[in-house]
Amino acid sequence: MISNYPGSEEAKVALQDLKSVYIELNDINSFAAYANSLGGNVRFEVSEQDSLTYLAAEKLFMRGDNEGARRSLTNYLQTFPQGAFSSNANFYLASIAFAKKDLEEAKRLFSLVLESGDTKFREESWARKAEIEYLDKDYAAAMESFKHLQAVAENPENKEAAKLGLMRCAELTGQPQEALLAANNLLKEPKLSPEIMSEARYVRAKAYISLKQENKALADLKEISKDTRTIHGAEAKYLLAQLYYDNKDDKNAETVLMNFIENGTPHQYWLARGFILLADIYIRQGDDFQARQYLTSLQNNYKGDDEIAAMIEDRLGKLKK
């Protein structure tokens, strides 16, 4: 039909049907070769070949055929390196690499999407790039990416992720002022989970302590330390007692530590630090017997492989003098 009656309406319809078949087969190149061989008024323009080659590959991606999509998208980019859909293709290839945990390749491709200036996938590309850099422990780079994400994010989840990422990176890179600002910014979010809210208050309290503004940390420490089942709650309990101790408020420090011991925690390191601080309180009060009792008990029962043993030895050594 197509070759026998090339100018007829029937031939045009048949050619369109044939094109659909080749799209489904993901073989646009063969269709292009055939169409261009017909001569006459039949021309398969490069722009249409660009579009259809991409659409065939995109269909595979949308169906969940990641391996087929990867091959087809790669072929598209090789055939049309400056194609109209190169940014889309790079984004989908990046998503496939990310799903396969090929993070280095995913970051390279997400970066290409961002460099293209195409805004369609900008938000998700910044989100994934920041996540990859964070997972790679490249916190300085991740911090910059989270800043970009915060500036462009419209999705509520990405907005929260940007603020959370900024806060964590600031803390991990030893920037208490930045961490404080980021924590305050995150705490303005209306629908934070209890875990994230607790983490933000913990980071804020630690930032205040680093900035020598300990009194401002008290409210957060008191709130977080209500639940010593969490790692942040256990550390906050110890830090609260330490702040009281540093301010010569032995009574409140002892009360906090006794409550800590009574309620317990799965985080034995911070409980051990609490016992040592309690011994320090008794040493300062001249009650060496009580201090020695706590230290000896801790020495006999603590199983951790960290600096606790040395801290106990140091204090017991001083008590013998």
Task: Please tell me what each predicted stretch does.
Residues 1-321:
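Acidic, polar-rich low-complexity tracts and alpha-helical solenoid repeat scaffolds
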